[in-house]
Regions:
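Core AdoMet radical
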Residues: 103-115, 126-142, 156-173, 183-217, ...
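Distinct, well-ordered alpha-helical segments
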Residues: 144-151, 172-182, 242-251
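Canonical Radical SAM [4Fe-4S] cluster-binding loop centered on the CxxxCxxC motif
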Residues: 80-117, 343
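Short Lys/Arg-enriched alpha/beta "domain-start" segment
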Residues: 1-36
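N-terminal [4Fe-4S]-dependent radical SAM core
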Residues: 34-36, 40-89, 320-324
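Conserved C-terminal portion of the radical SAM core fold
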Residues: 132, 188-191, 214-277, 282-309
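Short, electropositive alpha-helical surface patch
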Residues: 151-154, 242-259, 315-331
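Flexible mid-to-C-terminal extensions adjoining Fe-S/redox cofactors in radical SAM and related proteins
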Residues: 3-7, 315-367
Length: 367
């Protein structure tokens, strides 16, 4: 499978211990004064905190200024933040207080609190004006560690805009909500918060957690009233696809300060792959309900965005809401996309989109 960009390479050897590094020539590398990371490059150096790596394809996949992670046990170097990436996203935890049946990154209880600090150091040293995504798990589940993450960014003089994916439940605590808003004052943040149902029964079923709907709704209210930027997100499944318009009605009647609704196709990975047969509804069946939701959003002044769909199955009258949303390190174009005139405008498919999912799409587009 040919991915758009290789984000993980196997190396021959390296002098670097496990950890994060800035790809840079040792001779002209200036580490951050408060939160420095060592440098790594194909060329050797006698300079302390400058390391060498022997790795085919390293220069093709990574460029100066990128942040990479070295794992000697796996003999792998992985891109953490890349200047060549269409989107950069950092995982800060694998723990979550929801158990979504369609989760592509199933939660676990492995020790991972170091990821918050690693992410903060990576962002400070990468120092980009482009938006960086923060995801989990649930990034706000460990409130203390999330606050530390934000404090490091602020102390490091960093103002990188962030797109933080959270289930929003932590914001039901109004004191914590106020604390986060204060910590966020030096940067633009877009909070991506999911609402998968128009009532408690449906949303709680989708996330497999009784009481989640009430906390998410309260969190949305608390956060929206502070003037923070919120992108509402709905993953479409067999359980909720016929209620997309109802979700739109709830958002428009309850949250006048939310202006964006992202409607998302499944990523067939993790629990979504395990539960595929009970979750997946064909794109062809989804689209009439998506169109209805989009038109209702438009009437109410709510912007719609369509994520993770093939362009060829998106009706012409709603293609202006289409987004090339799949990260370049996990997207590809199957053979039946070859020769398609719209390929450059299409986001393609997740690399996990194989088997029944892909066969279904092939039948629908009649390739």
């Amino acid at each position: 499978m040919n991915l758009e960009r290789d984000n993980e390479l196997r190396f021959e050897s390296t002098s670097a211990p496990d950890g994060l590094y800035v790809v840079a020539k040792a001779s002209n590398y200036m580490p951050h004064p408060e939160f420095p990371l060592p440098s790594i490059d194909l060329e050797g150096s006698s300079r302390e905190e400058a390391y060498e790596i022997k790795c085919d394809g390293f220069s093709d996949s990574f460029t100066y200024g990128d942040i990479v992670a070295v794992s000697n046990n796996r003999k792998k170097v992985s891109g953490i933040l890349s200047k060549n990436a269409k989107q950069n996203t950092l995982l800060v935890t694998e723990r979550c207080d929801n158990l979504c049946s369609f989760c592509s990154q199933p939660p676990n209880n492995n020790p991972d609190t170091h990821l918050y600090v690693d992410a903060a150091y990576a962002i400070v040293n990468f120092n980009t004006d482009s938006m960086v995504g923060i995801t989990g798990g649930e990034p706000l589940l460990n409130k203390r560690k999330f606050s530390t993450f934000m404090e490091i960014l602020n102390k490091g003089g960093n103002t990188t805009p962030l797109h933080i994916l959270t289930n929003g439940r932590a914001f039901s605590d109004s004191n914590f909500c106020s604390q986060v808003v204060e910590l966020s004052s030096k940067r633009y943040i877009l909070w991506g918060i999911p609402l998968h149902g128009h009532n408690q029964e449906l949303h709680d079923k989708c996330v497999s957690m009784p009481g989640a709907f009430v906390e998410t709704m309260q969190g949305l209210m608390n956060l929206s009233y502070t003037g923070q930027n919120i992108e509402l997100r709905t993953v479409v499944t067999k359980d909720n696809y016929k209620n997309l318009k109802n979700i739109s009605e709830l958002v428009n009647s309850s949250f006048p300060f939310i202006f964006t609704h992202a409607i998302m196709n499944l990523e067939p990975k993790g629990w979504a792959k395990r539960n595929f047969d009970s979750l997946y509804v064909s794109v062809k069946e989804q689209m009439p309900h998506i169109s209805e939701c989009v038109f209702n959003n438009t009437l109410k002044g709510l912007e719609s965005m369509l994520f993770n769909y093939p362009l060829c199955e998106t009706p012409k009258n709603i293609q202006k809401y289409y987004c090339k949303s799949i990260s370049d390190w996990k997207n590809y174009y199957p053979a039946f996309c070859n020769g398609c005139a719209d390929k450059n405008d299409c986001g393609g498919f997740f690399s996990s989109s194989v088997g029944d999912y892909l066969n279904n799409i092939k039948l629908e587009v009649k390739v």
